[in-house]
């Protein structure tokens, strides 16, 4: 008999809670995503996260301890050697990653692009982080006139290649992306995903077509999600979760346009009758505010998210468990534009916790979440991680 019929796992992308013990190795001494945002905002207003025990993990401006938190609380340390989205999420589901994925806030190295040009016979333009629509406005006409390839990246570990379908036929674009995929498996580059981004139209009126194709990496081993799916449990992936795991172990995928859309979708899954895992990633914190070093926007987004939690609390049943965490930090007042190596919060709540919660021991790996989910549903335990299921008292 499962202790919980449904587990709702929410990853607040990049919401770190202070430098990790090994932060110095990553150039991240002093990083503190929530703490610095709270300072910048002169106090964060997150009453619902506070009720769950956020301030009991650590007090910050506007975020204080409560005498009787509703849930269990602690923080988790990442064991893997990266600080990117894929590494964090893969570890959450029971894997240990010793080769970090790379992000390219300054664009890709010249030697990689030289090799790509040589192997494809086409010049490369762009080579910077950009929004897909903006880069077409900027370089689409040049791409059409010259037959070159627009290469760009984003805040994540991706290499995207855009070309007009009438200039570079789809088959050729896909071949080019396969070449890029091979080149970027090298540990120096280690790109999580290569994406073909074909477009059509005329200058000033370009549109991306549905012929996008992703060349992703599958997780380097079986995750708890694979075990759940193979045991006929539901695994509902919301937001970019399905992409992060390349669809592995996913039974249903719900795309989202924003954090608020993500919260709408999680409320939708709360209304569904299923047995298994609902897994949500809220990417806006990271993509719109962390990388752009916008502490004000980040703080407002955190408060907006917090204001949606009562809808979740209201619909949670006695045999549901809500787990809230993050996958890495991205301190918007830290130098540079990259993620930061931080502890992440962990909050666990169920309406069945009548006595409220208490502090859990510090987690030595994000994989403790995967182990807890696996133990709850009686599936094969991951190689890494220690379950805290029995510490959650009803």
UniProtKB/Swiss-Prot annotation:
Instruction: Give the record's cofactor note, including how many are bound.
Output: Binds 2 manganese ions.
Domain of life from the UniProt record: Bacteria
Subcellular location(s): the record lists: Cytoplasm
Example GO BP = metabolic compound salvage
- Mind telling me which InterPro entries this protein's record contains? Alkaline_phosphatase_core_sf, DeoB, Metalloenzyme, Phosphopentomutase_DeoB_cap_sf
Cofactor(s) it depends on: Mn(2+)
**What name does UniProt use for this protein?**
Phosphopentomutase
């Amino acid at each position: 008999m499962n202790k919980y019929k449904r587990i709702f796992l929410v990853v607040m992308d990049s919401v770190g809670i202070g430098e990790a013990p090994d932060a110095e190795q990553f150039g991240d001494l002093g990083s503190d995503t929530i703490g610095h945002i709270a300072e910048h905002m002169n106090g964060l207003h997150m009453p619902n996260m506070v009720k769950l025990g956020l301030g009991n993990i650590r007090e910050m401006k506007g975020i204080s301890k409560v005498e009787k938190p509703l849930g269990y609380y602690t923080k988790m340390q990442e064991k893997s050697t990266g600080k990117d989205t894929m590494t964090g999420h893969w570890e959450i589901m029971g894997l240990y990653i010793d080769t970090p994925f790379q992000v390219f806030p300054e664009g890709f190295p010249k030697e990689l692009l030289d090799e790509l040009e040589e192997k494809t016979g086409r010049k490369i333009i762009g080579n910077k982080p950009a929004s897909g629509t903006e880069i077409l406005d900027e370089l689409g006409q040049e791409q059409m006139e010259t037959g070159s390839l627009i290469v760009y990246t984003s805040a994540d570990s991706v290499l995207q290649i855009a070309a007009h379908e009438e200039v570079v036929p789809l088959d050729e674009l896909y071949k080019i992306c396969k070449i890029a995929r091979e080149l970027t498996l090298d540990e120096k580059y280690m790109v999580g995903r290569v994406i073909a981004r074909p477009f059509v139209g005329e200058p000033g009126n370009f549109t991306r077509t549905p012929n996008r194709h992703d060349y992703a990496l599958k997780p380097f081993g079986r995750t708890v999600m694979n075990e759940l799916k193979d045991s006929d449990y539901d695994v509902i992936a919301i937001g970019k979760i399905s992409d992060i795991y390349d669809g592995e172990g996913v039974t249903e995928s719900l795309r989202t346009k924003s954090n608020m859309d993500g919260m709408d979708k999680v409320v939708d899954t709360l209304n569904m009758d299923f047995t298994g895992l609902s897994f949500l990633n809220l990417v806006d914190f990271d993509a719109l505010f962390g990388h752009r070093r916008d502490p004000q926007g980040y703080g407002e987004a955190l408060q907006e998210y917090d204001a949606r939690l009562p809808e979740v609390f209201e619909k949670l049943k006695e045999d549901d468990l809500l787990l809230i965490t993050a996958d890495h930090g991205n301190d918007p007042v830290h130098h540079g534009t990259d993620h930061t190596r931080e502890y992440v919060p962990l909050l666990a709540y169920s309406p069945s916790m009548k006595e409220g919660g208490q502090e859990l021991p510090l987690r030595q790996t994000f994989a403790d979440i995967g182990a807890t989910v696996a133990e709850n549903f009686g599936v094969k335990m991951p190689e890494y991680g220690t379950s805290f299921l029995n510490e959650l008292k009803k």
